[in-house]
Amino acid sequence: MQNKRNQSRVLWLLLIYITIGIFIYVGVNSLIGTPDVSKIEYSELVQMLEDKKIVSLEIEDSGYARARDNRGLYYETYAPTLLSDQQYVYGLANQGIEIKYVRSLENSWWISILTFLLPVFLLIFLFTFLFRSSGGGANQGMNFIKSPAKKYDPKKTRTTFNDVAGVKEAKEELTDVVKFLKDPKVFNRLGARMPKGVLLVGEPGTGKTLLARAVAGEAGVPFFYISGSDFVELFVGVGAARVRDLFNQAKANAPAIIFIDEIDAVGRQRGSGLGGGHDEREQTLNSILVEMDGFDPSIGIIVMAATNRPDVLDKALLRPGRFDKKVVIDRPDAEGRKDILKIHFRGKKIAPDVDLEVLARATPGFVGADLENLVNEAALLAARNGEKFITMKDCEEAIERVIVGPERKTRVLSEQEKEVVAYHELGHAILGTILPNADPVHKVTIIPRGYAALGYTLQLPSEDRYLMNKSEILDDIAVMLAGRAAEEIIFDEITSGAENDLKRATEMARRMVESFGMSEKIGPVAWASESEETFLARELFREKNYSDETAKELDSEVKQIINKSYEKAKSVLLENKEKLQFIAQYLLKKETISGQELRDLLQKDTDDLKEYVENLGVSSTQEEAKVVNYEYLSRENNLIERKGI
């Protein structure tokens, strides 16, 4: 195969060199030996002939004439009369003027043929290059319209439900699909109709692709994998052709599973995009719909698709007879995370102190991909440190690296900046500890990590929860604003470090007013749009469902919630100002303190706390606070990461 490619490459290079050589030859042949020529009128040439100044004359069949005078200068003019008036030319020859007839370059037959064939050769070369680039080899140009789907043989790379954890309900939903693929006749005999399509809906990293492969592995049938973006190419009609080819391959290997990942790339609502109603994406979608209607369900083909944006899919995809079975894959709970960790720790050497239950509780909101990354980071850290086993310390550091990134040891802060960061983070931490509805604090640090965090506070919900009441949300907003409040109280100045806190607090307050109906003035009315995600094609043409007057009231309510929460944060910090100052000195000495340490310090009275901090004398060998628990920014699936600066 490699020799054929090399031979083809040599032939094309040879063709290119020959073409370039012809152009060079023509150009040089037309230029070499041709002196400077002056353009003159025909009447001037006639006058010079009468004055006997011309010694030679070249007449081209194109009508142009080139003359040389007795001084060796050349002249050129358009003189078609010299071609038709032969007696006049004979008379010039009798006067001793050298007459020569030449064929013009433009009328040369081989130049004409070259001019015609060269563009054809170039077009053939261009299209052949494109087809071969897409097809992957010589004589495979038609592969350009063939489906690029990858076929997985369950006998070679088998994935089963034992390799999938944390999605118990989803596996139960897909058990019928497995049974149907194993023996379709059982369902056909009873008159049951299995769904033609199964849509897996879940956030990125929840294991949609892995679950689809597990279904194929359990059933022992071929698995065709393709991404939605693979259908759309430069040339119109390629996507539809690839859809037809994909279904033909599946029918030839039935029973089989067709899995289309990120189907929203081609399955978005038609007529709502910026490309008009007849773009390539819509043709591809139409082809998918036709194919799903056309194949016989009794032959044992199941079309599975995955998306994290079900709100933008075309309704025709979701109607009965197409993707009429929807399986939601949610983030795993603590028990599910423990099972996922067991799978990823298989075959790895772990120390006896590694407690999977503790790690599962320490990672709320983590999806399967996050947990896989966590285990890999822990293994890399153990290898980097020359350890024989993965320890609990490696796992704890890995969690922190996944959430906020590695330590930035090269980022050296000035003493003044360190002090600002310490007070900012303690503002978050003290509010999180004192307010009754806030999530418990588990770590406060002023060690820079990741891209932008100069310090951070980690909180962890005591349990997996799926609802938040109004008091919890208001306390969360107060905690977010407490970093800025602490800066204002201590330094009578504010910094840019609260930018992220302000964004998150404002967003949460707006959701309270517009989505949750938690504003007493506005009442239980939902003003937010249907989708929290931005979809450009919709947003351009969507009209607000409320007036400008209502918009002012909504903004006013959001601002009022923020202001009240900020005043609440300042009030709590002012009541504990002295403790804030002493604990800040403690944090500056230790750089990292645990949530339990912080709670113990806040329980001391002011005098005892002052004496304790002054007599601390932290040495470089003193053991730092051991942190086990980490968290996400809210129960809205964001990291609970108080990035101070």
Curated annotation (Swiss-Prot):
The lineage of its organism: Bacteria, Thermotogati, Thermotogota, Thermotogae, Petrotogales. The keyword Manganese does not apply. It comes from Petrotoga mobilis (strain DSM 10674 / SJ95). Homohexamer. One of its GO terms (biological process) is protein catabolic process. Keywords: ATP-binding, Cell inner membrane, Cell membrane, Hydrolase, Membrane, Metal-binding, Metalloprotease, Nucleotide-binding, Protease, Transmembrane, Transmembrane helix, Zinc. This is ATP-dependent zinc metalloprotease FtsH 3. Its cofactor is Zn(2+). It comes from the Bacteria. The chain crosses the membrane at residues 12-32, 111-131. Binds 1 zinc ion per subunit. One of its GO terms (cellular component) is plasma membrane.
